[in-house]
């Protein structure tokens, strides 16, 4: 999936769950803000929205007994581990990796739970 320019959520990333779609928008906004204002505070804010979203999404999956929950949680943990190594100012290649990861994760992994939560 191509990284949208400007980097922003659009309807092609809609999961049909309003709360998840709203949180996905915050992930796009967090990475975009980090690319524009590459500060320690922005990095911490970006990490925080990812942690909160993954917690919320995984909670919804667990509640629905989603069959791919463990696998999906592992993918989230892998991303957070990579993000945990980022230091401000974050290298552009790392921000680009985060953007590419997000635009691929939603349609390949998150879309698997459409209609199942």
Swiss-Prot record:
One of its GO terms (molecular function) is iron ion binding. SUPFAM superfamilies: Hemerythrin-like. Fe cation 2 binds at residues 57, 72, 76, 105, 110. Signal peptide: none annotated. PROSITE patterns: HEMERYTHRINS (PS00550). Keywords: Iron, Metal-binding, Oxygen transport, Transport. Fe cation 1 binds at residues 24, 53, 57, 110. Belongs to the hemerythrin family. Hemerythrin is a respiratory protein in blood cells of certain marine worms. The oxygen-binding site in each chain contains two iron atoms. Octamer composed of two types of chains: alpha and beta. This is Hemerythrin subunit alpha. It comes from Lingula anatina.
